[in-house]
Curated annotation (Swiss-Prot):
Protein's UniProt keywords contain Transcription: yes
UniProt xrefs under InterPro entries: TMEM18
Protein name in the entry: Transmembrane protein 18
MF terms in GO: DNA binding
GO cellular component: cytoplasm; nuclear membrane
Any Pfam family matching the protein: TMEM18
KW DNA-binding (keyword) present: yes
BP terms from Gene Ontology: cell migration; eating behavior; energy homeostasis
Short sequence motif named Nuclear localization signal, residue ranges: 130-138
Residues forming coiled coils: 117-140
Gene expressing this chain: Tmem18
UniProt xrefs under PANTHER family: TRANSMEMBRANE PROTEIN 18
Length: 140
């Protein structure tokens, strides 16, 4: 008898993936904890530029490897999951693994753009002050 959570033909739509997933599985809870830790590291690394670069690169590499992770998980799903979630299209791995990692990467890029704009603004203000000082010296 099939469980209401069993997936024979994996749905294509995101709401269907969310509804048909058994979110109480330990490996999914562990993945959720991993994503929360990544989000915390993203937030707390804002003042540490080198740490943030390393974190960003790790996120991008993990997203790049998602296809390979999906293939390995599809072959070995019985070792850690109740149901086969890993389809050839990669919808499930994209939703539960790659999307949160890409969100973190996007937050980091937004932080970098904001920081760059702040530095550019500060530089422009400094240039204006220097220009004003030079102008005053010439008037004297």
């Amino acid at each position: 008898m099939a469980s209401p959570y069993s997936v024979r033909v994996f749905p294509v739509s995101i709401p269907a993936v969310i509804m048909e997933t058994d979110w109480t599985e330990p490996w999914l809870l562990g993945l959720l904890a991993f994503h929360l830790l990544c989000l915390l590291l993203t937030c707390f690394s804002a003042q540490r530029y080198k740490l943030q670069i390393g974190h960003f690169l790790c996120l991008v590499v993990l997203v790049y490897c998602a296809e390979y992770i999906n293939e390995v998980a599809a072959m070995n799903w019985r070792l850690f999951a109740k149901y086969q979630y890993f389809d050839s299209r990669g919808m499930f791995i994209s939703l539960v693994f790659s999307a949160p990692l890409l969100f973190n990467a996007m937050v980091i890029v937004i932080m970098w753009v904001r920081k760059t704009l702040t530095v550019m603004s500060d530089l422009k203000n400094l240039q204006e002050r220097r220009k004003e000082r030079k102008r005053r010296r010439k008037e004297e």
